[in-house]
Curated annotation (Swiss-Prot):
Family: Belongs to the AAA ATPase family. CDC48 subfamily.
Record keywords: ATP-binding, Nucleotide-binding, Repeat
One annotated GO molecular function: ATP binding
Regions that span the bilayer: none
SUPFAM superfamilies reported for this sequence: ADC-like, Cdc48 domain 2-like, P-loop containing nucleoside triphosphate hydrolases
Protein name as catalogued: Cell division cycle protein 48 homolog MJ1156
Source species taxonomy: Archaea, Methanobacteriati, Methanobacteriota, Methanomada group, Methanococci
Length: 903
């Protein structure tokens, strides 16, 4: 039975697998079962696929879902009608494939390709795609044995040719399909009706008596898929694709730039249907009244003339791409030239998931990889960012197995390739390195602060959840009940109460991007630059929404206007800030959080509803909150049994969160200082030896000068004279005079080495740390032994000199001097080695002495004497009064009624 069905695009998971999906009712009508082979006949060719059940949402629509490769094989596009019937096929004995572009492959690659296409149905001329570590390679079936459509089995012999097929080499049609584009369903639909429809069915427009569109302008941030969309349209429409990049057509000769542009348009018309794609069109067609050079003006005029002169009735279409549409010459943006402007925006969650599915399509993913989670956490990521994320995750997986790979070998073992998997941990690590493109120019953080990291402040946390987290996480609920979420929140209170920490926590818990803005970064000496900085911050935030903009110390950025003549710049910044807050259209998913300890000097216009809707007092913590803060800051500390956190919470009335953190840190430092105690005896003796060797370095230098003098004097003669002999004895005598005490100090250090090892063996150190200490002791023994040996050599030299007469040969003198110089050199280099050993011993002592350090009650009591509360009762009363004025915080009277502690 044969049935006509309408072609629809494939699901992402089916791309490249050679399968077609038909709804269950149509399959039953055609007598098909899942796994059967069907023939898909289009007007220009046939394709063969394995059929599977479609989803119920397709029921009654009469559609067949096939990917771009099957559509090309059948010579059809989305929306065309094809004839579908069940066919019987034979098993392939041999299949010969050729790439569409030159490639080189090593031994074993044919088996790899065979595993990838196992079970697929192939016919001569059909295309198949093979995923290799995230990259898709396209092959064309050159021949099959037996002829006709065949299924690849375990017994099929697959042969690969290295040379690409000739007809593929000559084409200018890009190898991109609509399934390679994620998150742009609506945009693809618009572009198809503007470009693909006139190219494939010009008779429709002739019947209506209208001119088909000549141009489409794609507008959107970099990396959103503008170029990819243009390539996909060209491929699906079967059009030749010509790319114009500004620098390539520019020439230093007058008129040659316009000539280059004309040639491209002429070639496109000759080879119609064609698509001319002008990337970053704002670079070659800027506003003529603002253009600085004559070349740009002439180029714009030429482009206008060429677009007006297109006669192909939809067979030649110009697609321009830009992220700066307002920089384009207005004459280009009228109907008849660029008829339609399509905005390619930042993808939403579903769009991000589609893009991730595309880029992980050819990756060996581990079972723990959750693309839904990745789509949730990649707010603000465009397609290029998600591609970079997948690539970075794959590189991390590769780095993990790299040590076990012999890079010099001709071929990587099959078991290594089979075990190469990209895990969820690889993606999580990659997320730390890859950030949204829109956020790279602004200070952006991914805060790692959670609600449980903030002690107390339960009322403030709840208000922030309601004002920020709920609208971002459950936007549809607010839309349903018709409530506009707050645009901004002002946190005010004394310094150190946790305002910045709260902003970070709400950004983290809501899963939003976080832009931190500080006053000095905003202000510029150039007129208009400060306001521009504010505009850019909000633009970037909207682009990477959901996003939280955090203005710390906002009183420095937005003080009351009109104070004096010198405040002109800040007045303009305030005006710009007000405009941006009012201009945030619904729903933009951008929330402003500001923090200050001086709300009284902020411009009142900022604090009205519709701008900073919520004004929340962040108070000094009460006793319960202080206890929570103590628990947070001491959770990783080794507290003694006598430490009572409840008692400490009572004693720290008026302390802010920052004060309590400083208190805990000071108590810990006191405990560490006490536990480290006195240095070990080996350290004392070794330091004495080092100090002594440093003190005698001057004697060594003086002896070296005298030795050099003797060398010069005896260089020309065969023997030394009496004066030179005496000078030599004098130099060696100086060295001996200082080395006798050195030997005693060396022996004193040697005695302590065994004691040092006894201490190390008693302590509960890691085996590696004990091994390191033992190696250090052996190294020290070796150095000290060599130094003692050198001292003995000096004594031997002195004895030798005493037995010699004053007439000594030059050779004997030379030997004595060289030996003495070696001894001096050895002592000098040993000094640095001994210093390094001393540092290592100190480091070991710190590990040993602080291993079981406990922070006691007395340490906290001493710290309390040192760390005083930074906020007085009078200060807190001022903040409570301000809170009552704003009418948006809990008053003192209400707290008293509820029996709460009041500062």
């Amino acid at each position: 039975m044969v049935k006509e069905l309408k072609v629809a695009e494939a699901y992402q998971g089916d791309v490249g697998r050679g399968i077609a999906r038909i709804d269950p009712y149509t399959m039953e009508e055609l007598g098909l079962k899942p796994g059967d082979v069907i023939e898909i006949e289009g007007p220009k060719g046939k394709a063969y696929a394995i059929v599977y059940r479609g989803f119920l949402e397709d029921a009654g629509k009469g559609i067949i879902r096939i990917d771009g490769y099957l559509r090309q094989n059948a010579g059809v596009a989305i929306g065309d009608r094809v004839k579908v019937k069940r066919v019987e096929i034979k098993e392939a004995k041999k299949v010969v494939l050729a790439p569409t572009q030159p490639i080189r492959f090593g031994p074993g690659f044919e088996d790899f390709v065979k595993r990838k296409i196992l079970g697929q149905v192939l016919s001569k001329g059909s295309k198949v795609t093979i995923g290799v570590l995230g990259t898709a390679l396209t092959f064309v079936v050159v021949s099959t044995t037996p002829a006709g459509p065949v299924r690849v089995t375990d017994f099929t012999h697959v042969e690969l040719k290295e040379e690409p097929v000739s007809e593929i080499k000559e084409t200018k049609v890009p190898d991109v399909t609509y399934e390679d584009i994620g998150g742009l369903k609506e945009e693809v639909k618009k572009v198809r009706e503007m470009i693909e429809l006139p190219m494939r069915h010009p008779e429709l427009f002739e019947k209506l008596g209208i001119e088909p569109p000549k141009g489409v302008l794609l507008v959107g941030p970099p990396g959103t898929g503008k170029t990819l969309l243009a390539k996909a349209v060209a491929n699906e429409a079967g059009a030749n694709f010509y790319v114009i990049n500004g620098p390539e057509i520019m020439s230093k000769y007058v008129g040659e730039t316009e000539e280059n542009l004309r040639k491209i348009f002429e070639e496109a018309e000759e080879n119609a249907p064609s698509i001319i794609f002008i990337d970053e069109i704002d670079a070659i067609a800027p506003k003529r009244d603002e253009a600085t050079g004559e070349v740009e003006r002439r180029l714009v005029a030429q482009l206008l003339t060429l677009m007006d002169g297109l006669k192909g009735r939809g067979q030649v279409v110009v697609i321009g791409a830009t992220n700066r549409p307002n920089a384009l010459d207005p004459a280009l943006r009228r109907p008849g030239r660029f008829d339609r402007e399509i905005v390619i925006g930042v993808p939403d969650r579903e769009g991000r998931k589609e893009i991730l599915q595309i880029h992980t399509r050819n990756m060996p993913l581990a079972e723990d990889v959750d693309l839904d989670y990745l789509a949730d956490v990649t707010h603000g990521f465009v397609g290029a960012d998600l591609a970079a994320l997948c690539k970075e995750a794959a590189m991390r997986a590769l780095r993990r197995v790299l040590p076990s790979i012999d890079l010099e070998a001709e071929e990587i073992p099959k078991e290594v390739l089979d075990n190469l998997k990209v895990t969820m941990d690889d993606f999580k690590e990659a997320l730390k390195d890859v950030e949204p493109s829109a956020m790279r120019e602004v200070l952006v953080e991914v805060p790692n602060v959670k609600w449980e990291d903030i002690g107390g402040l339960e009322e403030v946390k709840q208000e922030l959840r309601e004002a920020v987290e709920w609208p971002l996480k459950a936007k549809e609920v607010f839309e349903k009940i018709g409530v506009r979420p707050p645009k901004g929140v002002l946190l005010f209170g004394p310094p150190g109460t946790g305002k910045t920490l709260l902003a970070k926590a709400v950004a983290n818990e809501s899963g939003a991007n976080f832009i931190s803005v500080k006053g000095p970064e905003i202000f510029s000496k150039w007129v208009g630059e400060s306001e521009k900085a504010i505009r850019e911050i909000f633009r970037k935030a909207r682009q990477s929404a959901p996003c939280i903009i955090f203005f710390d110390e906002i009183d420095a950025i937005a003080p009351k206007r009109g104070r004096d003549l010198s405040s002109a710049v800040t007045d303009k910044v305030v005006n710009q800030l007000l405009t941006e807050l009012d201009g945030m259209e619904e729903p933009k998913d951008v929330v402003v959080i500001a923090a200050t300890n001086r709300p009284d000097i902020i411009d009142p216009a900022l604090l009205r509803p519709g701008r900073l809707d919520r004004v929340i007092l962040v108070p000094v913590p009460d006793e319960k909150a202080r206890l929570d803060i103590f628990k947070i800051h001491t959770r990783s500390m080794n507290l003694a049994e006598d430490v009572n956190l409840e008692e400490l919470a009572k004693k720290t009335e008026g302390y802010t969160g920052a004060d309590i953190e400083a208190l805990c840190r000071e108590a810990a430092m006191l405990a560490v200082r006490e536990s480290i105690g006195k240095p070990w005896d080996i350290e004392v003796k070794l330091r004495e030896l080092i100090n002594y060797l440093q003190s005698i370095s001057g004697t060594f230098r003086a002896a070296a000068v005298e030795l050099n003098s003797v060398i010069k004097a005896t260089k020309e003669r065969e023997s030394a004279e009496a004066g030179e002999f005496s000078e030599l004895k004098n130099a060696i005598g100086k060295i001996i005079s200082v080395l006798s005490p050195a030997k005693e100090k060396i022996e004193a250090v040697e005695k302590e080495i065994d004691k040092f090892l006894e201490v190390i063996n008693k302590e509960e150190l890691k085996p590696s740390e004990k091994d390191e200490a033992q190696k250090l002791a052996k190294y020290l023994k070796d150095i000290l032994g060599k130094l003692k040996e050198m001292i003995d050599n000096i004594y031997e030299l002195e004895n030798k000199l005493n037995t010699l007469k004053e007439q000594v040969s030059a050779e004997e003198i030379d030997e004595i001097i060289k030996t003495t110089q070696n001894i001096i050199q050895r002592f000098t280099t040993s000094l640095d080695e001994l210093k390094n050993i001393l540092k290592d011993i100190e480091s070991i002592r710190l590990k040993v002495s602080t291993k079981d350090v406990k922070i006691k009650k007395e340490h906290f009591m001493k710290a309390l004497e040192k760390i005083k509360p930074s906020v007085s009762k009078e200060d807190m009363r001022v903040y409570e009064k301000l809170a009552q004025e704003y009418g948006r915080a809990t008053s003192v009277e209400k707290k008293k009624e509820e029996g709460k502690e009041v500062i």
